[in-house]
């Protein structure tokens, strides 16, 4: 038994090391690649200072943090709701952030600065989160709280559809770009949004013990002495914050929160002591690689990153499911 535990521990360490190396390689490639290839030896030249440190580095950091936040949000929701299909958009938090952003675009008539749009997106996500917490205070079961989130998501989606229908052509282009996701406008002015993600990410990665209890199911978690009501509120609030900030930075990026935790579990990473940091590393790497493809696939334009993540990730996910089912 001890030998099996040691083997599993070594395997977990190997996975984390491999994911760390993958993320570092993707980080290096992201800083080098672009319209002009700039090798590490040229990073401290005047050209490198402009392209690498002022343009590519803030974008790369934003991509890493958003990818980690979305993947960890998916892992938290899947444990909290005992549903492998749970992801950040399921509770309506992503759509709530979208409603806040769309309201800011339409009411501000395109004149609001980026920081104001970011605050509106975070406010929309937190409003939906507060509504969910109000439901949670009524001590609803996990399944009913999940259904309440789905209903809120449908309402927010309907509001966004109405807003797009009545928007002008200029607003429509901005809204459609947001709905497909992208990091094209990110620079150091959004550093406050990046800093807003880091404390919550680090805190959640340290909560493996309650997460492991939640993954056992609601009844087992209560029997083990976990204050379920408290942890449900805290985790829903933390997820709402991360999703709101991510939407403010990059718009709507689907698929990552659903697939990354699922793929890691299929690879044997079921303990949240390993799964949570693994999701952060894998999510950051996946979104960063997708962002590189989005930048380089077309010479004259940039692809929406949400389309790239779905196109590249869906076949891999299907293959892993088929492989696991054999």
Swiss-Prot record:
Under the heading Pfam families, the entry gives: FecCD
Task: Tell me which GO cellular component terms the UniProt record holds.
Answer: plasma membrane
TM regions (residue ranges):
15-35, 61-81, 88-108, 112-132, 146-166, 184-204, 240-260, 274-294, 302-322
Task: Give GO terms for biological process.
Answer: cobalamin transport
Question: Which GO MF terms are attached to this record?
Answer: vitamin transmembrane transporter activity
Q: Which domain of life is it from?
A: Bacteria
**Membership in a protein family:** Belongs to the binding-protein-dependent transport system permease family. FecCD subfamily.
Q: How does it assemble?
A: The complex is composed of two ATP-binding proteins (BtuD), two transmembrane proteins (BtuC) and a solute-binding protein (BtuF).
> Do you know which HAMAP family this protein is assigned to?
BtuC (MF_01004)
Protein name as annotated: Vitamin B12 import system permease protein BtuC
């Amino acid at each position: 038994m001890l030998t099996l535990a040691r083997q599993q521990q070594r395997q977990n360490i190997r996975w984390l090391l491999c994911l760390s190396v993958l993320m570092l390689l993707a980080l290096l490639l992201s800083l080098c690649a672009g319209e002009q290839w700039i090798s590490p030896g040229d990073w401290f030249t005047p050209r490198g200072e402009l392209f690498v440190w002022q343009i590519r580095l803030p974008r790369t950091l934003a991509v890493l943090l958003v990818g980690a936040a979305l993947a960890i949000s998916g892992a938290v929701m899947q444990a909290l709701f005992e549903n492998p299909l749970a992801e950040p958009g399921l509770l309506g938090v992503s759509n709530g952030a979208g409603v806040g952003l769309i309201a800011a675009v339409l009411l501000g008539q395109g004149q609001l600065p980026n920081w104001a749009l970011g605050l509106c997106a975070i406010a929309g996500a937190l409003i939906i989160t507060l509504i969910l917490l109000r439901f949670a205070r009524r001590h609803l079961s996990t399944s009913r709280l999940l259904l309440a989130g789905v209903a809120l998501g449908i309402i927010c989606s309907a509001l966004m559809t109405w807003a797009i229908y009545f928007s002008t052509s200029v607003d429509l282009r901005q809204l459609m770009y947001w709905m497909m996701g992208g990091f094209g406008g990110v620079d150091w002015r959004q550093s406050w949004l990046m800093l807003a993600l880091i404390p919550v990410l680090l805190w959640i990665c340290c909560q493996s013990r309650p997460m492991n209890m939640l993954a056992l199911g609601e009844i087992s978690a209560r029997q083990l002495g976990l204050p379920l009501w408290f942890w449900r509120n805290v985790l829903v609030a933390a997820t709402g914050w991360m999703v709101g900030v991510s939407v403010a930075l990059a718009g709507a990026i689907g698929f990552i929160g659903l697939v990354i935790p699922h793929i890691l579990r299929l690879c044997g990473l079921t303990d949240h002591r390993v799964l949570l940091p693994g999701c952060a590393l894998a999510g950051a790497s996946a979104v960063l690689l997708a962002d590189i493809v989005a930048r380089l696939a077309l010479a004259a334009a940039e692809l929406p990153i949400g389309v790239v993540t779905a196109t590249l990730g869906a076949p891999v996910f299907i293959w892993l499911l088929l492989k696991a089912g054999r």
